A protein has these predicted regions:
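C-terminal capping region of solenoid repeat domains
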Residues: 1-54, 63, 76, 251-395
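Flexible interhelical turns and helix-capping residues at alpha-helix boundaries
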Residues: 85-88, 188-191, 347
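Concave beta-strand-loop units of leucine-rich repeat
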Residues: 114-116, 137-141, 166-170, 192-196, ...
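Long hydrophobic alpha-helices with heptad-repeat/coiled-coil character
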Residues: 155-186, 260, 272-273, 379-383
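Solenoidal tandem-repeat scaffolds enriched in leucines and small polar residues
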Residues: 184, 188-285
């Protein structure tokens, strides 16, 4: 039989519930209102089934600092850091002051590869301050930050750089390149290929590197007579010089041929095209001054004739000669070059003519290298090394 609820009966139940609530002790009430602790739980990976497991509490905290001074010797920490690449080393330096001081040691920053990176000017100077010796900035973009008027700029000390590759680098402001060159007075190798305008002030800073051996200025622009004279008058230990396609004026070409250092072993003076100053007389002047030349590139110098080959043959150490697209030279004169290892004449003769040269000039190799490697930082299989100096970490 169904039970019938009357209004009086409902009021009786509410009164009964109130009496039970009032009879509850304060301790029971606080227990009921307490929320469960969710932090010890975590969701485990798996299928659609939701499983929650209780996390095991860690051991009692200890006051021992296992990485503090005196526990692990500093020499051991230096050894550990020597196996880290630059990215992991920076992460380690951000953990504590001790690791930051250890990570700043110059032994970890002897070389650095920033190929194609976007980097601020202040960050680049901070890297140079860590006494980097070999720095690759090929195709990098260097930006300039905007600082408030009250910002205190740090004093830029002389850099320890010996090998610097800034080929195809992009500078937001030409003054950035000048600031970098102002810090570098001990360079052994420098590449400014495709770096845009090289003014007289930059040439003066380059000239301060009196021990410079490799200098690549290919496709740079705006060289003045004063700038080129400053460089060639101071850098008398140059072994490899590349000034191809630099759009030199006639006066600058004459001065360059007169001031080339006798120490040169590899020279690229290509791309003068129809400049009348790049003639047989200046080729004679080059051969008389630089008698130790082992490789000479005169490609796209269309004014020179076969008469210049008489002077080239006097270079006893010459092993590689490139005269590609020198249309003013009579092809029959090529047969007089008997003592070369490599002879590049791209665009001067036909395919049949190449076969004739290979048979008549044997064992000279014909048309082996279409691109010049004179003073070029990366050459051959070492795509991350510059002038045979490594720039890449082990991993």
């Amino acid at each position: 039989m169904d039970q019938t609820y009357s209004p009086g009966h409902m009021s009786y139940e509410l009164v009964k519930a109130d009496e039970d609530f009032l009879s509850t002790t304060p301790s029971d009430y606080s227990i009921l209102r307490r929320r469960p602790e969710t932090s010890p739980y975590y969701r485990t990976p798996g299928p659609a089934i939701s499983r929650f497991l209780r996390r095991r509490y860690s051991v009692e905290p200890t006051s021992s600092d296992y990485l503090g001074n005196g526990t692990i010797p500093t020499t051991v920490m230096y050894k550990i850091c020597s196996y880290l690449n630059k990215k992991d080393l920076l992460h380690l330096m951000s953990t504590c002051k001790r690791f930051r001081d250890i990570g700043k040691d110059s032994s970890f920053w002897q070389f650095l590869n920033l190929y194609g990176k976007h980097i601020s000017c202040s960050s680049l100077h901070a890297i140079i301050d860590r006494k980097v010796q070999v720095l690759r900035l090929n195709s990098a973009t260097i930006n300039v930050e905007v600082f408030p008027p009250w910002h205190n700029f740090p004093i830029l000390n002389p850099a320890m750089l010996t090998h610097l590759d800034m080929s195809s680098s992009k500078f937001e402001n030409p003054s950035v390149l000048l600031e970098i060159l102002q810090r570098c007075h001990n360079l052994y190798a420098l590449s400014l290929e495709l770096c845009g305008i090289i003014d007289d002030q930059m040439c003066k800073e380059i000239a301060k590197n009196t021990n410079l051996y490799f200098l690549n200025l290919a496709m740079a622009k705006s060289f003045s007579a004063e700038g080129i004279v400053t460089i060639l008058s101071s850098c008398r230990k140059l072994g490899e010089l590349n000034i191809g396609w630099t759009e030199l004026s006639g006066d600058v070409i004459n001065l360059t041929c007169q001031l080339l250092p006798p120490s040169l072993k590899r020279l690229s003076f290509s791309g003068t095209r129809d400049k009348a100053e790049m003639n047989d007389d200046n080729i004679k002047r080059i051969c008389d001054t630089c008698k130790q030349l082992e490789e000479l590139d005169l490609s796209d110098d269309v004014v020179i004739t076969e008469n210049c080959l008489d002077h080239v043959k006097n270079l006893k150490n010459l092993r590689i000669l490139t005269i590609s697209r020198c249309y003013g030279i009579e092809p029959m004169a090529f047969l007089s070059l008997q003592n070369l290892d490599i002879f590049n004449v791209y665009g001067c003769v036909t395919v049949e003519g190449i076969d004739v040269l290979r048979s008549r000039l044997r064992p000279t190799r014909i048309n082996v290298s279409p691109l010049s490697s004179i003073a070029i930082p990366t050459d051959g299989e070492s795509v991350t090394s510059i002038w045979k100096k490594r720039t890449r970490d082990w991993y």
